[in-house]
Amino acid sequence: MMTRRRLAVAGAAALVAVVALLLGGVLATSPAASPAAPAAAPVRVLAGLSPGGTAGLVSRLEVKIQRNPSDVKSLATLGLAYEQRWRETGDSSFLPLAAHALRNAHALSPNDPLTTQGLGSLALTRHEFGRARVLGRLAILLAPYSANPYGIKGDALLELGRYPQAFAAFQKMVDLKPNLSSYARVSYARELSGDLPGAITAMQMALDASAGDREGYAWSSVQLGKLYWMRGDGRSAKRLYDNALQIFPGYVYALDALVPVEAARGHLRRAIALEKRAVDAIPLPQFVGQLGDLYARAGQPRLALEQQATVRVIQHLLGFNGIKVDLETAIYRADHSIDPAGTIALARKGHALRPSILGDDTLAWALARGGRCAEALSWSTHALRLGTHDSLFYFHRGTIEQCLGHAASARTWFARALALNPNFSVRFAPVARRSVS
């Protein structure tokens, strides 16, 4: 069994780049996925609530706190429920409300474990990773036999590039409570360490651990499907996404995950329709961005540009509500060749706060798009230091080699990206194919 033995992650310390929301959610299973989304391995404090159930809980708690403003448990739970509402709706205005409730709870009871964990979760959500690390350590002191605080601490350490320490935190987490959340982190660690078969095994365990939890099952199915998709197995990926939608109709992360599968099959109109459904439900920037790429591929440049404008608005709103999205914004700008000099500056700022492999690759990509390819090469090498098999990382490296005039090396990296998944990106897989040919 995996539950009591050491986590076997070949070749590197484990890395799990996730935002730990105590209310559940989804784990971003690719380093290039946008953590501005409400993305996390579920740590299920308010498990089992439907979106309507969470809204009702918020209303009841608000009334309760009006009657008794000193109710610490209700304040902390309200803060967590506001975070849940953000996850369910994509409306980042819930996050200042969460912060207000949790700060009030903390002022009344500085050593309350649930409040401290909630503040740590919120810090991760806002990409305040240094603060999240401190809060995670404090949460462990307050509740040393609870697994959740180790998730907060580990997630923060990972984003700070502290891989051995993060691995130790997650080892403790899985030792204390082997469950969906722990297994998901094992899976992601193995994925980023280049062990996709091991990642699939661990995510299957997460799926098996989700029995009785509809959202947990849908979430795990999508993550498992994405692992199959990463290695080019579209049939298995589609089966798992369809399973998620059967259990949880309209599940937006399954709708979005189906999009590249349908696009790869040549069903571009269906892919656009699926992404529009996801965007209409929760307008996350990565959903809108992919919709724009689909429109561009379909020969509809006006609609593609409209999505770019929408992404800018969403990113502005996220920043206004306290989420640091420098890296996500830099990735998007670099992808679309928007203001190369400004994008490099933004990538440097994001990397300083978040020196993970995602930060390394983002900086490398921004530098490459700005023509500073010698410096980009160094950061690309650093981004690949864990042995991660990621087609976008490979594509970025190929572009850098091409920029430096290393034609043979560039073709090798493009071929590696396509060998892993010939349809790794709606936008860039065709570019890689042309470069190889």
Kindly give the residue locations of the regions a language model identified.
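Residue-level recognition of tetratricopeptide repeat
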Residues: L80, R87, S121, D155, ...
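Canonical tetratricopeptide repeat
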Residues: T77, G118, I152, R185, ...
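Short coil turns that delineate tetratricopeptide repeat
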Residues: P69, P110, P144, K177-P178, ...
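N-terminal leader/linker segments that initiate helical-solenoid repeat arrays
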Residues: T3-L108, P113-L114, V134, P422-N423, ...
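Structural motif corresponding to the intra-repeat A-B loop/turn of tetratricopeptide repeats
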Residues: R85, T89-S92, R126, L160, ...
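TPR alpha-solenoid repeat register
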Residues: S74, T115, P149, S182-Y183, ...
